[in-house]
Amino acid sequence: QMVLAADYAVEHNIGLVPDLDLRSARRAFISSYPDELQEMLRLQEVKLEKKKSTETIIASIDNLNDHYAGGKIPPYNAVKNNVLRVYAYKNGPAGIEPKTLSDITQQCRIEIISEDSVRIIIPPAGKNQPHACAMVSFTLFYPDIFGPHLIEFQKQILQQYSDARLSGVCKDEWGFPPYFPRFYTENTYDFWYSKHSAEEYARKTGGRELLSDCLLMARPMKKKETERQVAVNNFMEMVLQRNILIENSFYDAVKEIFGKDAAVTV
């Protein structure tokens, strides 16, 4: 059909520039690479009870959609979740006191409610640890921006239409799923995350752990403001450079497959 449409356009002196964004082919991507899905890491801080357990429920964001999700194309919603870590600490006027910070994940009870929500039962507050932060990863129906096969898959889509006389290719507003101000919830902090982005972060920062640095970025820590700023800059720069690489690869692939005069548009 694409070949016929392109031929018709050429015959009528019209340039056909279809949208061939891989987000429209998410089912095919996920079928081929089920371990390369984007995750949203949600951090939720709670005040702990002194003498009894504290229960908290963390849920994913509903209707995480845009114009690439609708009709017969599934939304970007969560397909599973995983409690990655629970920290306990004291959060004072100057921020989290690092000496009080400890990993209490193994002491918590976890109950999966559904693909998009989880209940965590946290034990009573320990000495100098009146606060806790649960870190839950929600795997989305969306390709991992840092997935090792994403760029290759993007090019394969274009190659499927190499026999069509297209004037170019477009894709609109590439990047992570949409995140709007209405999604913000007090004491909840969200980061785009995946095992592949964590590996890249460690590589770029000389071995730092993205998961623990997400807590540092989310909540100030006493006497660690400079370290926090560096973590934010490292994370943002890593995301920027990865998306530049993806966009440049798309541009180069369009020119290679459809010719140097092919349009690359949004």
Regions found by a protein language model. Name each.
Residues 171, 175-266:
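Gly/Pro-rich turn-and-neighbor structural signature
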Residues 1-177, 252-253, 257-260:
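Mature N-terminal, pre-catalytic/accessory segment of carbohydrate-active enzymes
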